Amino acid sequence: MEGEGVQPPDENLENGSRPRFKWKKVLRLVVSGIKAAGLLLCVVYVCLQFSSSPAKDSPIQRLRAPVTGCEGGRLFIGTSKNEYETMEVQNNSVIINCDGLYLIHLKGSFFQEVKINLHFRKDRSPIFVPMLNNGQRVVFTVVTSLAFKDEVYLTVNASDTLCEHLQINDGELIIVQLTPNGYCAPERPYSSTVNQVPL
Amino acid sequence: MEGEGVQPPDENLENGSRPRFKWKKVLRLVVSGIKAAGLLLCVVYVCLQFSSSPAKDSPIQRLRAPVTGCEGGRLFIGTSKNEYETMEVQNNSVIINCDGLYLIHLKGSFFQEVKINLHFRKDRSPIFVPMLNNGQRVVFTVVTSLAFKDEVYLTVNASDTLCEHLQINDGELIIVQLTPNGYCAPERPYSSTVNQVPL
Amino acid sequence: MEGEGVQPPDENLENGSRPRFKWKKVLRLVVSGIKAAGLLLCVVYVCLQFSSSPAKDSPIQRLRAPVTGCEGGRLFIGTSKNEYETMEVQNNSVIINCDGLYLIHLKGSFFQEVKINLHFRKDRSPIFVPMLNNGQRVVFTVVTSLAFKDEVYLTVNASDTLCEHLQINDGELIIVQLTPNGYCAPERPYSSTVNQVPL
């Protein structure tokens, strides 16, 4: 019977190659240990990437809009649907959604002497815009700190001309955020009151 | 004979520890299932990363060049081999390769009254540069939208002096892109007509 | 005895399903090969990510500080603890740590005519700041190249008033780096000589 004559298969191995078989077992253990560690490393890394996926940088806030006239005492800021539009214009005011330092540039030529003030925050005095060519031309660049809820608009007055009769040539307003990645208010549905003007 | 006395090895197990053996088999299945899922997750993630490797941000387009004289009615724009050079100068024109909003800054002092115009696009009127100190000094900053194929150059004229006789002190032109990651034309081999000037 | 009647378990398989068994073995080899390759790919990718983890972009260097008076012939630059402070002010000088192109903006109103010069490097002539409103108002924007060890400060003099008696309204200095990721000196411990002023 087997018990006396025929040894179970494993026993046959052990006599002749017991150390080889042990070494093989250790090797197999080490390999699967390494494989498990490698897999664990990868899975942990992937999970970390997903959980800490870098907050998508908010796009640089910017606006480039034609300034084409005067309406209700304010310069009329048109908007043009091109890739520079990441800021909204409402009632000739540029709505600020993200905190940061902004570059504001205004240029244009008038047919009469005008005085322009740049407003951006209720409790702050406006910036009086220096003019050129006896008050008939503006090429003005300023840097200021703006924050969510600010609204940038430009009031204009001419001593002898009604606002609505003011004519402007080559008028343009550019606002660019210089320090992106500050606080940004959640985006609101784009309202329809913007002044659609072909650029 | 075996049939009566000696059972095959597996049968020996089953009687005494059949549930334990089944449980081991299920465990082994679950473990290898988890390992396979983990591996699949990692491989899919790695492939996604490779396939969607974020387009390398194009470097911010910028130029800082000395303005040292006048040539052919244009201010002579030298170029200096330093890390600010990502834009090419040809025939005293700065070649624009990437769309975006740019800050252009010009400064310098002349020995006579001059008038400078900033040109950047064929079908657009140039920007008349306001001067200081009776037209003998310029410290001018403007923001404008430039696009591929635009060329920035500065025409200068003085009522009583030939262009080539104009002398400029501390002249410098700086152009910096404020909104990188717009469209960029594929890079062309750098041509040799630029004006090499030690800064 | 076994030799004649009872074959070892493997032998039983071979006769009837030898090709099936071989095919299974090949399949198992292929699967573990794929698993090993997949695991290797992931581990190599993860290691590459760790070893080449993108140098953390240095934050855009910027300062927005109130300018509130005059001290030792220099405009007094206060500092306010808000998120715009990534630059240090010492002895009314803004310390430059990172190379790059910077936008410098100064605004303010005085009660007398003043002359202001913008200094930033020992061996460079200062920039004479153009004034408005008969020298009593400044709204000035300039772009210049600054480097580690530069110090930005503003000297001011008034023909008939002592520096310490000069009064300024709505004075503000803003400095913003336009080309981040240039060379930055290692950060030094923040010194205590800065002028703490509530903004």
From Swiss-Prot, chains A, B, C:
Cytoplasmic face residues: 1-25
Subunit structure as annotated in this protein's UniProt entry: Homotrimer.
Recorded GO CC terms: cell surface; extracellular space; membrane
Transmembrane segments: 26-48
Glycosylated residues, chain numbering: N91, N157
Gene that encodes it: Tnfsf4
Superkingdom of the organism of origin: Eukaryota
Location within or outside the cell: Membrane
Protein name per the record: Tumor necrosis factor ligand superfamily member 4
Main location, first listed in the record: membrane
Record key words, sorted: Cytokine, Disulfide bond, Glycoprotein, Membrane, Signal-anchor, Transmembrane, Transmembrane helix
Tissue: Detected in T-cell lines, but not in a macrophage cell line.
Biological process terms in GO annotation: acute inflammatory response; CD4-positive, alpha-beta T cell costimulation; cellular response to lipopolysaccharide; cellular response to nitrogen dioxide; cellular response to prostaglandin E stimulus; cholesterol metabolic process; defense response to nematode; immune response
Gene3D superfamilies: 2.60.120.40
Family: Belongs to the tumor necrosis factor family.
GO terms for MF: cytokine activity; tumor necrosis factor receptor binding; tumor necrosis factor receptor superfamily binding
Extracellular compartment segments: 49-199
Organism per entry: Rattus norvegicus (Rat)
Record's function text: Cytokine that binds to TNFRSF4. Co-stimulates T-cell proliferation and cytokine production.
Cystine bridges: C70-C163, C98-C184
Membrane topology of the entry: Single-pass type II membrane protein
Alphabetized PROSITE patterns for the sequence: THD_1 (PS00251), THD_2 (PS50049)
The THD domain, residue ranges: 59-176
